Structures are given as structure tokens and as C-alpha cells.
């Protein structure tokens, strides 16, 4: 299995502020990787380092077999879509398509026109007059027209309503299917339910550090929620890694990374979903920043 992204001890400082610290992650090719964490966790910083838009303070980063760099050969392989949707509001989608053809050697203008026609998005209206969901679709179609091998998406659906998000993610998964295994995606978002629908890999950041990285199904299988009486849990803690614990007067609830079978009959073990896993590693609702990850998702 080839690797699309690999970092070792990657760090980035802005004067006295550490934006990313000791970041070591691996993302195989042909994956949709969820990049998740509260505001200020370092998600945008990591994406910019992967895209070659920023230089690391320390550590190493390897993207598609080489170091990110600002040269045409590397940039042709990378699609980067910023959260603010970088479109010229007075230009039409057709204007953007023609400009892209002059700037990108592998430009696929037909794919943009086809995707936008399928979505009933007009080519000859100024993009500033389109809805937020339509602008996001135009930006994604233009980014995909580069035919990148790595697509970096920085919270592209943050301002969209649930239906527009669903359409956007549908376009993304269709592009993956059409790529023939030649596309890897890193999708940054606060919306855990959306990520759970389309992603098969995860990078979880908190406080500028990597908390979790790996295949989602594998990680879910390695974790359980254990619920039982409030008592000494030292035996459980020796057998398993306790990620998060909630104790009441009568009951203990543990999120654990399994170190083997659960032998204690007093505890009931249940599977975890992605939201439980993410919030467990981030300390559940311990800080206001974590509430973003549930409150926004409840809009669906």
C-alpha cells in the first residue's frame, strides 16, 4: 500500500505561538481522511504545510513521495480548497473554467461543465449571485478539474445547510469513484456525522498535537465503552488503556482502547461510534470548543 502523506515530528511556530507540535501521521493513498479538532487545534496549519503554502519549523513532511514545494510539477498534483471559497464573485463559472485552462496543464474543462450541468448550476451567472451551496460546488468542481492526486479541503461545508452539505459530499464521493484509485482526500470539518458518512481514515488534533490517526474501522474495533459499578478499576486500567472516564455515585463509564478481552463480568462492553471516539479523546464536553463538534452536527 502506497503512502500519500507522511509526517514525522512536524511542528510549526508563529513567533511565540505553537500552531502544530510533534505531528506524526500517515495517510495511505486512495483514502478520504477526516481532519478533525476544535478551532485552533492546528488543522489549517497542517493543510497549508501539506500544500507547500507554509514551511515547517521542525520535523519532516512527505507528500506524494516528496517534500511539498512551490514549483509547477508539485502544485499540479495538489488541489487545495480554502474555507473562504476562493472565487472571484464578479466572474462567472465559465470565466473561472477558462482561466483554469490557462493555469493548469492537466485541466479538465469538460468535467467542470458536466458536474455543474448535473447540479443545474448556471455557467454564465456571476458566482457572487449563486447560493452558498452552489458556490461551494463550483469551487469543488474547479479544484477537481486540476485532476489532483491529493485534494485538501479546509472546512468547505462549514457554512452550508444540511442539504447543500449532502450534495457537496455526494460530489466528492463520486469524484473518488471516478478517479480509479488516483485520488486521496483530506477533509477538515467539525461535522462528525458528515465525516462518518464519507471518510475511512482520521487525523484527530487537539491542542496542536495529534491525538489519534488511523483507519476508522480499525480504530472503532480497538475501542469499547465499558459501563459498570463504581468500584476500583485498577485491574481494568492495567489491562486496557483508559481514554476517558466518567464516574457517578453508583456507576463508572470508561472509553478504553482494548489491550485484550474484557474479563470483568460486572462491566458491560459496547461498541463505539465515531462521535464517541472523537469526543472521548478530546475530553468529551470538557471545554466550550468541543461543543462545536456536537452542536453543529445536531443541525442535521
Language-model region placement:
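ABC-family P-loop ATPase nucleotide-binding domains
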Residues: 83-138
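Conserved ABC transporter NBD signature motif
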Residues: 27, 58-74
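Helix-to-loop junction immediately C-terminal to a conserved catalytic motif
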Residues: 51
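ABC transporter nucleotide-binding domain
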Residues: 167-256
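The feature captures the beta-strand-to-loop junction immediately N-terminal to the Walker
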Residues: 36-38
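Catalytic Walker B motif of ABC-type/P-loop ATPase nucleotide-binding domains
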Residues: 151-155, 160
